[in-house]
Protein backbone atom coordinates (compact mmCIF):
# COMPACT_ATOMS: atom_id res chain seq x y z
CA UNK A 1 0.00 0.00 0.00
CA UNK A 2 1.18 3.49 -0.91
CA UNK A 3 4.46 2.24 -2.36
CA UNK A 4 6.46 3.30 -5.42
CA UNK A 5 6.01 1.03 -8.46
CA UNK A 6 8.14 0.70 -11.60
CA UNK A 7 6.89 -1.12 -14.70
CA UNK A 8 9.84 -2.99 -16.23
CA UNK A 9 9.94 -3.50 -19.97
CA UNK A 10 11.60 -6.54 -21.48
CA UNK A 11 12.79 -7.77 -24.85
CA UNK A 12 12.57 -11.54 -24.61
CA UNK A 13 14.16 -12.07 -21.20
CA UNK A 14 16.31 -8.92 -21.19
CA UNK A 15 15.16 -6.04 -19.00
CA UNK A 16 15.28 -2.64 -20.72
CA UNK A 17 17.95 -0.23 -19.54
CA UNK A 18 15.41 2.55 -19.07
CA UNK A 19 13.59 0.34 -16.55
CA UNK A 20 16.79 -0.15 -14.55
CA UNK A 21 17.33 3.61 -14.61
CA UNK A 22 13.83 4.13 -13.24
CA UNK A 23 14.36 1.49 -10.56
CA UNK A 24 17.37 3.49 -9.38
CA UNK A 25 15.31 6.68 -9.26
CA UNK A 26 12.34 4.86 -7.76
CA UNK A 27 14.53 3.57 -4.92
CA UNK A 28 15.60 7.13 -4.09
CA UNK A 29 12.01 8.36 -4.14
CA UNK A 30 10.86 5.45 -1.96
CA UNK A 31 13.61 6.17 0.57
CA UNK A 32 12.60 9.81 0.72
CA UNK A 33 8.95 8.88 1.23
CA UNK A 34 9.71 6.13 3.73
CA UNK A 35 7.94 3.47 1.65
CA UNK A 36 8.93 0.39 -0.35
CA UNK A 37 9.93 0.03 -3.99
CA UNK A 38 8.00 -2.54 -6.01
CA UNK A 39 8.51 -3.62 -9.61
CA UNK A 40 6.25 -5.30 -12.16
CA UNK A 41 7.41 -7.33 -15.14
CA UNK A 42 5.29 -9.32 -17.57
CA UNK A 43 6.33 -11.70 -20.33
CA UNK A 44 6.56 -15.29 -21.52
CA UNK A 45 9.17 -17.69 -20.14
CA UNK A 46 10.72 -15.04 -17.93
CA UNK A 47 10.55 -16.79 -14.54
CA UNK A 48 14.10 -17.35 -13.32
CA UNK A 49 15.55 -15.11 -16.05
CA UNK A 50 14.66 -11.54 -15.07
CA UNK A 51 14.81 -11.46 -11.28
CA UNK A 52 18.54 -10.74 -11.01
CA UNK A 53 18.25 -7.98 -13.59
CA UNK A 54 15.76 -6.15 -11.36
CA UNK A 55 16.33 -6.98 -7.67
CA UNK A 56 19.87 -5.50 -7.40
CA UNK A 57 18.44 -2.01 -7.93
CA UNK A 58 16.88 -2.00 -4.48
CA UNK A 59 13.51 -3.63 -5.16
CA UNK A 60 11.60 -4.73 -2.05
CA UNK A 61 8.99 -6.71 -3.95
CA UNK A 62 8.95 -7.94 -7.54
CA UNK A 63 5.75 -9.07 -9.25
CA UNK A 64 6.57 -11.48 -12.11
CA UNK A 65 3.66 -12.17 -14.46
CA UNK A 66 4.69 -15.11 -16.66
CA UNK A 67 2.29 -16.55 -19.23
CA UNK A 68 1.91 -17.28 -22.90
CA UNK A 69 0.60 -14.25 -24.77
CA UNK A 70 2.37 -11.64 -22.64
CA UNK A 71 5.27 -11.35 -25.08
CA UNK A 72 5.54 -9.72 -27.54
CA UNK A 73 3.80 -6.80 -25.86
CA UNK A 74 0.18 -6.10 -26.72
CA UNK A 75 -1.88 -3.39 -25.07
CA UNK A 76 -4.82 -5.17 -23.44
CA UNK A 77 -3.12 -7.86 -21.29
CA UNK A 78 -0.47 -5.53 -19.87
CA UNK A 79 -3.08 -2.85 -19.16
CA UNK A 80 -5.23 -5.36 -17.27
CA UNK A 81 -2.25 -6.53 -15.23
CA UNK A 82 -1.35 -3.04 -14.05
CA UNK A 83 -4.90 -1.78 -13.55
CA UNK A 84 -5.99 -4.81 -11.51
CA UNK A 85 -2.73 -5.00 -9.57
CA UNK A 86 -2.87 -1.30 -8.73
CA UNK A 87 -6.47 -1.62 -7.54
CA UNK A 88 -5.16 -4.18 -5.03
CA UNK A 89 -1.87 -2.55 -4.07
CA UNK A 90 -2.87 1.13 -4.34
CA UNK A 91 0.56 2.60 -5.15
CA UNK A 92 1.16 6.31 -4.75
CA UNK A 93 3.64 6.51 -7.65
CA UNK A 94 4.11 4.56 -10.89
CA UNK A 95 7.04 5.12 -13.24
CA UNK A 96 7.60 3.70 -16.72
CA UNK A 97 9.82 4.41 -19.70
CA UNK A 98 8.82 6.99 -22.31
CA UNK A 99 9.16 4.32 -24.99
CA UNK A 100 6.79 3.01 -27.63
CA UNK A 101 5.40 0.63 -25.01
CA UNK A 102 5.29 3.20 -22.20
CA UNK A 103 3.54 5.75 -24.39
CA UNK A 104 0.86 3.18 -25.17
CA UNK A 105 0.53 1.60 -21.73
CA UNK A 106 0.81 4.67 -19.49
CA UNK A 107 -2.24 6.56 -20.80
CA UNK A 108 -4.36 3.39 -20.78
CA UNK A 109 -3.57 2.70 -17.14
CA UNK A 110 -3.93 6.30 -15.97
CA UNK A 111 -7.25 6.65 -17.81
CA UNK A 112 -8.60 3.42 -16.34
CA UNK A 113 -7.65 4.53 -12.83
CA UNK A 114 -8.65 8.19 -13.42
CA UNK A 115 -5.22 9.38 -12.34
CA UNK A 116 -2.83 11.84 -13.96
CA UNK A 117 0.17 11.13 -16.18
CA UNK A 118 3.06 13.42 -17.08
CA UNK A 119 5.04 12.33 -20.15
CA UNK A 120 8.75 12.79 -20.88
CA UNK A 121 9.80 14.05 -17.46
CA UNK A 122 13.38 15.28 -17.11
CA UNK A 123 13.36 15.39 -13.30
CA UNK A 124 11.40 13.70 -10.53
CA UNK A 125 11.46 15.08 -7.00
CA UNK A 126 9.44 14.95 -3.80
CA UNK A 127 8.02 18.17 -2.40
CA UNK A 128 5.07 19.91 -0.78
CA UNK A 129 2.29 21.81 -2.53
CA UNK A 130 -0.18 24.50 -1.46
CA UNK A 131 -3.33 24.85 -3.55
CA UNK A 132 -4.16 28.56 -3.54
CA UNK A 133 -7.75 27.92 -4.65
CA UNK A 134 -8.76 25.30 -2.09
CA UNK A 135 -6.19 26.41 0.51
CA UNK A 136 -5.22 22.79 0.99
CA UNK A 137 -1.68 21.81 1.93
CA UNK A 138 -0.24 18.60 0.47
CA UNK A 139 2.81 16.82 1.86
CA UNK A 140 5.34 14.84 -0.17
CA UNK A 141 3.88 14.91 -3.66
CA UNK A 142 5.76 13.80 -6.76
CA UNK A 143 7.12 16.82 -8.63
CA UNK A 144 6.96 15.83 -12.30
CA UNK A 145 9.28 18.25 -14.06
CA UNK A 146 9.53 18.73 -17.83
CA UNK A 147 10.00 21.47 -20.44
CA UNK A 148 6.72 22.88 -21.78
CA UNK A 149 5.41 25.34 -24.37
CA UNK A 150 8.03 24.45 -26.95
CA UNK A 151 10.82 24.35 -24.40
CA UNK A 152 10.34 27.96 -23.36
CA UNK A 153 9.60 27.12 -19.73
CA UNK A 154 10.23 24.29 -17.29
CA UNK A 155 6.94 23.12 -15.79
CA UNK A 156 6.55 21.40 -12.43
CA UNK A 157 3.40 19.29 -12.48
CA UNK A 158 1.69 17.77 -9.44
CA UNK A 159 -1.23 15.40 -9.03
CA UNK A 160 -2.56 16.16 -5.53
CA UNK A 161 -5.73 14.11 -5.27
CA UNK A 162 -5.58 11.08 -7.55
CA UNK A 163 -3.38 8.00 -7.32
CA UNK A 164 -1.13 6.72 -8.58
CA UNK A 165 0.93 9.72 -9.61
CA UNK A 166 2.25 8.54 -12.97
CA UNK A 167 5.21 9.68 -15.04
CA UNK A 168 7.17 8.48 -18.04
CA UNK A 169 10.87 9.17 -18.50
CA UNK A 170 13.05 8.76 -21.58
CA UNK A 171 15.99 6.39 -21.63
CA UNK A 172 19.22 8.03 -20.47
CA UNK A 173 17.57 10.79 -18.44
CA UNK A 174 18.17 9.01 -15.13
CA UNK A 175 21.39 7.30 -14.08
CA UNK A 176 21.23 3.62 -13.20
CA UNK A 177 23.18 2.22 -10.26
CA UNK A 178 23.15 -0.98 -8.22
CA UNK A 179 21.65 -0.26 -4.79
CA UNK A 180 24.14 -0.61 -1.96
CA UNK A 181 21.61 -0.48 0.86
CA UNK A 182 19.26 -3.18 2.10
CA UNK A 183 16.06 -4.19 0.33
CA UNK A 184 13.73 -7.11 0.95
CA UNK A 185 14.05 -8.61 -2.51
CA UNK A 186 10.80 -10.58 -2.27
CA UNK A 187 9.56 -12.17 -5.52
CA UNK A 188 5.97 -13.21 -6.17
CA UNK A 189 4.49 -15.00 -9.19
CA UNK A 190 0.79 -14.08 -9.41
CA UNK A 191 -1.75 -16.20 -11.27
CA UNK A 192 -2.01 -14.26 -14.53
CA UNK A 193 -5.52 -15.60 -15.25
CA UNK A 194 -6.83 -13.72 -12.19
CA UNK A 195 -5.67 -10.44 -13.67
CA UNK A 196 -6.08 -10.89 -17.44
CA UNK A 197 -9.35 -12.07 -19.06
CA UNK A 198 -9.08 -14.38 -22.06
CA UNK A 199 -10.64 -11.71 -24.28
CA UNK A 200 -7.51 -9.56 -23.80
CA UNK A 201 -5.52 -12.00 -25.94
CA UNK A 202 -7.58 -11.26 -29.06
CA UNK A 203 -4.62 -9.51 -30.73
CA UNK A 204 -1.78 -11.80 -31.84
CA UNK A 205 1.61 -10.59 -33.05
CA UNK A 206 2.41 -12.66 -36.14
CA UNK A 207 5.85 -11.29 -36.94
CA UNK A 208 8.27 -8.61 -35.75
CA UNK A 209 11.07 -6.77 -37.52
CA UNK A 210 13.53 -4.84 -35.36
CA UNK A 211 15.70 -2.36 -37.21
CA UNK A 212 19.36 -2.39 -36.20
CA UNK A 213 20.71 0.80 -34.65
CA UNK A 214 22.48 3.07 -37.15
CA UNK A 215 24.72 4.62 -34.50
CA UNK A 216 25.51 4.67 -30.79
CA UNK A 217 24.72 8.29 -29.97
CA UNK A 218 23.36 7.48 -26.52
CA UNK A 219 26.48 5.58 -25.47
CA UNK A 220 29.11 7.75 -27.18
CA UNK A 221 31.87 9.19 -24.99
CA UNK A 222 32.26 12.15 -27.37
CA UNK A 223 29.34 13.89 -29.09
CA UNK A 224 29.70 16.58 -31.73
CA UNK A 225 26.30 18.25 -32.01
CA UNK A 226 25.12 20.82 -34.51
CA UNK A 227 22.35 23.37 -34.38
CA UNK A 228 20.74 25.81 -36.78
CA UNK A 229 23.97 27.81 -36.69
CA UNK A 230 25.68 25.09 -38.73
CA UNK A 231 23.85 26.62 -41.67
CA UNK A 232 23.25 23.69 -44.01
CA UNK A 233 23.33 19.96 -44.58
CA UNK A 234 26.77 20.41 -46.08
CA UNK A 235 27.86 22.11 -42.89
CA UNK A 236 27.06 18.92 -41.01
CA UNK A 237 29.59 17.10 -43.20
CA UNK A 238 32.29 18.97 -41.25
CA UNK A 239 30.77 17.78 -37.98
CA UNK A 240 30.74 14.18 -39.17
CA UNK A 241 34.39 14.54 -40.13
CA UNK A 242 35.28 15.96 -36.71
CA UNK A 243 33.32 13.22 -34.96
CA UNK A 244 35.14 10.60 -37.03
CA UNK A 245 38.52 12.02 -36.03
CA UNK A 246 37.50 12.05 -32.36
CA UNK A 247 35.88 8.58 -32.54
CA UNK A 248 32.60 10.15 -31.48
CA UNK A 249 29.04 10.49 -32.75
CA UNK A 250 27.10 13.35 -34.30
CA UNK A 251 24.04 14.81 -32.59
CA UNK A 252 21.76 17.69 -33.50
CA UNK A 253 19.32 20.20 -32.09
CA UNK A 254 15.65 20.13 -32.99
CA UNK A 255 16.08 23.18 -35.23
CA UNK A 256 18.70 21.38 -37.33
CA UNK A 257 16.52 18.27 -37.58
CA UNK A 258 13.45 20.31 -38.54
CA UNK A 259 15.52 22.00 -41.25
CA UNK A 260 16.18 18.57 -42.77
CA UNK A 261 19.95 18.70 -42.33
CA UNK A 262 20.21 15.53 -40.26
CA UNK A 263 18.03 12.53 -39.37
CA UNK A 264 15.66 12.71 -36.40
CA UNK A 265 17.34 9.77 -34.65
CA UNK A 266 20.32 12.07 -33.99
CA UNK A 267 18.26 14.71 -32.20
CA UNK A 268 19.42 15.45 -28.66
CA UNK A 269 16.97 16.84 -26.14
CA UNK A 270 13.53 16.52 -24.64
CA UNK A 271 12.02 15.10 -27.84
CA UNK A 272 15.15 13.21 -28.82
CA UNK A 273 17.99 11.30 -27.18
CA UNK A 274 19.45 12.05 -23.76
CA UNK A 275 23.23 11.69 -23.73
CA UNK A 276 25.90 11.60 -21.01
CA UNK A 277 29.21 11.85 -22.91
CA UNK A 278 32.56 12.74 -21.42
CA UNK A 279 32.79 15.58 -23.96
CA UNK A 280 29.92 17.40 -25.69
CA UNK A 281 30.87 19.84 -28.46
CA UNK A 282 27.93 22.12 -29.27
CA UNK A 283 28.35 23.72 -32.69
CA UNK A 284 26.01 26.57 -33.55
CA UNK A 285 23.49 25.57 -30.87
CA UNK A 286 21.73 28.39 -29.04
CA UNK A 287 20.73 26.25 -26.08
CA UNK A 288 16.97 26.03 -25.74
CA UNK A 289 15.66 24.39 -22.55
CA UNK A 290 14.47 21.28 -24.36
CA UNK A 291 17.93 20.72 -25.87
CA UNK A 292 19.83 21.37 -22.65
CA UNK A 293 17.61 18.79 -20.92
CA UNK A 294 19.19 16.13 -23.12
CA UNK A 295 22.88 16.95 -22.62
CA UNK A 296 23.37 18.98 -19.43
CA UNK A 297 25.00 16.07 -17.58
CA UNK A 298 27.91 15.81 -20.03
CA UNK A 299 31.33 15.75 -18.38
CA UNK A 300 32.77 18.67 -20.35
CA UNK A 301 30.69 20.99 -22.54
CA UNK A 302 32.41 22.97 -25.29
CA UNK A 303 30.37 25.65 -27.06
CA UNK A 304 31.26 26.92 -30.52
CA UNK A 305 29.02 29.89 -31.26
CA UNK A 306 29.24 33.25 -32.99
CA UNK A 307 26.95 34.70 -30.31
CA UNK A 308 28.84 35.19 -27.02
CA UNK A 309 25.49 35.61 -25.25
CA UNK A 310 24.05 32.27 -26.42
CA UNK A 311 22.19 30.56 -23.54
CA UNK A 312 24.25 27.39 -23.92
CA UNK A 313 27.36 29.34 -22.95
CA UNK A 314 25.99 29.61 -19.41
CA UNK A 315 26.50 25.88 -18.86
CA UNK A 316 29.57 25.46 -21.08
CA UNK A 317 32.97 24.69 -19.56
CA UNK A 318 34.78 26.16 -22.58
CA UNK A 319 33.51 28.73 -25.07
CA UNK A 320 34.91 29.31 -28.55
CA UNK A 321 33.45 32.46 -30.07
CA UNK A 322 33.31 32.16 -33.84
CA UNK A 323 31.36 30.61 -36.67
CA UNK A 324 31.20 26.87 -37.12
CA UNK A 325 32.61 27.29 -40.63
CA UNK A 326 35.84 28.81 -39.36
CA UNK A 327 36.31 26.93 -36.09
CA UNK A 328 35.52 23.29 -36.93
CA UNK A 329 38.00 22.95 -39.85
CA UNK A 330 40.72 24.28 -37.55
CA UNK A 331 39.81 21.74 -34.87
CA UNK A 332 40.07 18.95 -37.43
CA UNK A 333 43.38 20.28 -38.73
CA UNK A 334 45.05 20.69 -35.34
CA UNK A 335 43.70 17.42 -33.99
CA UNK A 336 45.20 15.57 -36.96
CA UNK A 337 48.52 17.33 -36.45
CA UNK A 338 48.71 16.55 -32.75
CA UNK A 339 47.40 13.00 -32.78
CA UNK A 340 50.01 11.50 -35.05
Residue ranges and their predicted role:
Residues 1-340:
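N-terminal glycine-rich FAD/FM-binding segment characteristic of electron-transfer flavoproteins
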Amino acid sequence: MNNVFVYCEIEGTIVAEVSQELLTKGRKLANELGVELEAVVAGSGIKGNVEQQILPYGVDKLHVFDAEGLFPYTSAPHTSILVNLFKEEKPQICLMGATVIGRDLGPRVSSSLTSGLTADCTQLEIGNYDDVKTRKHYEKLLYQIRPAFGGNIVATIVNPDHRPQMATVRSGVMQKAIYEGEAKGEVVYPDVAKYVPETDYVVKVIDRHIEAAKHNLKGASIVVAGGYGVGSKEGFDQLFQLAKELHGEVGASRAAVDAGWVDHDRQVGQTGVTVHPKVYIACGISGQIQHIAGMQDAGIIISINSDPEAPINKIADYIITGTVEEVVPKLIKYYKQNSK
